[in-house]
């Protein structure tokens, strides 16, 4: 979509439920001016380098390194930039997508993006800023998970599975999309009628009603960012396992 010396933006997956894009920002690169979305959540997961987020009525500056997650639910003022001296790479999520892809292509001027309201919008406490150290941890015999975000429109969990895990059998979700960004692998995914091996950096999406499952494709541990949009009660079921 965009590939210039100072920045690269690639859309990895585009569904009604969410759109996921991969960003590369060189030092000094900035996102849009502070803004709000009235009807959807704007979220970020840092892959490499450091991203500075400005959140809330006072534009509190928070710096995020790899593994950290930030989210601005509806009506939380936010923006972002690379304020460091090295390259930053990160994922950006709009949940639901609401035509964000076409907005980035210059074809949706009515997209849900607005100037900050006079009252500054919702408080900073409504935003999400999660580090691996303060994330909720869920541990099981063959797996461990970090809950990065649990909002009405999105659940985001960093999942790690050790060798010996038997995998997740093919299944469906009727009410939400189940998506994966592979961090460590390889991972074998079954989606619809296809089975493919996904290496780190691969995005996999199972829209509502699509059969999907996964398992190890090698002897190494596997790790991925798992996104449920909307949540569909997934985290509650996971906590009960």
Where are these regions (language model features)?
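Short beta-strand His + acidic residue motifs that chelate non-heme Fe in jelly-roll/DSBH
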Residues: 32-34, 53-54, 62, 72, ...
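Short, conserved beta-strand element in jelly-roll/cupin
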Residues: 24-25, 36-53, 93-95, 160-162, ...
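Double-stranded beta-helix
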Residues: 81-134, 213-241
């Amino acid at each position: 979509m965009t590939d210039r010396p100072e920045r690269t933006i690639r859309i990895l997956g585009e569904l009604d439920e969410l759109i996921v894009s991969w960003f590369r920002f060189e030092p000094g690169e900035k996102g849009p001016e502070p803004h709000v979305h009235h009807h959807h959540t704007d979220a970020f997961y840092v892959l490499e380098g450091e991203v500075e987020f400005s959140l809330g009525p006072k534009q509190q500056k928070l710096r995020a390194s790899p593994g950290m997650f930030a989210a601005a639910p509806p009506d939380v003022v936010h923006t972002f930039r690379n304020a460091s001296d090295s390259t930053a790479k990160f994922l950006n999520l709009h949940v639901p997508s609401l035509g964000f892809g076409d907005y980035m292509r210059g074809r949706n001027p009515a997209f849900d993006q607005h100037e900050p309201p006079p009252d500054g919008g919702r408080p900073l406490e409504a935003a999400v800023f999660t580090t691996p150290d303060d994330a909720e941890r869920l541990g099981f015999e063959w797996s461990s998970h970090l809950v990065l975000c649990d909002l009405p429109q999105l659940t985001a969990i960093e999942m790690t599975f050790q060798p010996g895990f038997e995998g997740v059998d093919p299944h469906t979700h009727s009410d939400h999309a189940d998506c994966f960004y592979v961090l460590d692998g390889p991972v074998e995914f079954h989606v619809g009628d296809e089975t493919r091996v996904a290496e780190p950096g691969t995005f996999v999406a199972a829209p509502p009603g699509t059969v999907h499952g996964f398992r190890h494709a090698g002897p190494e541990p596997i790790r991925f960012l798992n996104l449920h949009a909307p949540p569909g009660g997934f985290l509650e079921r996971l906590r009960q396992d």
